[in-house]
């Protein structure tokens, strides 16, 4: 895409990363109807599970996810109790339909204690019929990680860790309230590989406050030096009327459309030069990774978590605000954690 075309197409429209968009959801699908949809799935239908854990110990100002800050662990305990009830209810409707993929997002799943990582993973395996090979991915915040948690995630069956970086520039990090050094990130990547996790994804953002073209390229070089199998490069969406905490970002420090385009292109050029293949709009993968292979062979799919190679028949969302996709339609849980 040329710079002129990118600027011409710079319109305020719903993001391509989520479809259907928020205004399309309505209250017309009842709990009973959702249960029928689950039971109507063919017995051989493959299932992908998404588990939402909407808590962080601090809010990143750029975040557009359904999450809330808590400095106490008791709300998380109460939430996990309610989540267990939902898991058992959905599991009763799904029966022995095979689960082929599981993703934990948030929020910060890495905020969970070692005990709750183990008990939640155990509950999922006891409730659902896991296939022989299940891809288990989790979003990890390096600020939450401890030596004990690496082993806990490995014991839970983690196969891919997704780590948010956004940008390594200290000025940008202060502006978005996400302090995370390169050395800290490298330690997490090395530690998670040491316990046997074979795949790592790193998320980057462009269009952030005080971010520059050179800074985006520098971050891409640092990310590539960590050798993640996958990299996601998303554009920051500034919607303070929807996410009030984004009002902490001074709009005057945000790059314009031209600068955003150049940041994206600069980071892309670095990643491609480092051997990554571009996958769709916003993903990159090393040539041997399943995502790159699927892109080359036409087997790539996309869901609410981004691109995937898992050919599941239904995506089941668990937890507050979680979205599911079934042959009969899309569903979303209520946002409230109460």
Where are the predicted features?
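Flexible, acidic/Gly-rich N-terminal and inter-domain linker regions that tether
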Residues: 1-47
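Short, compositionally biased low-complexity segments
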Residues: 6-10, 58, 236-240
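A short secondary-structure junction motif
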Residues: 21-24, 59, 69
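C-terminal scaffold of the Radical SAM
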Residues: 39-46, 69-93, 97-338
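Local cysteine-cluster metal-coordination motifs and their immediate loop/turn environment
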Residues: 51-67
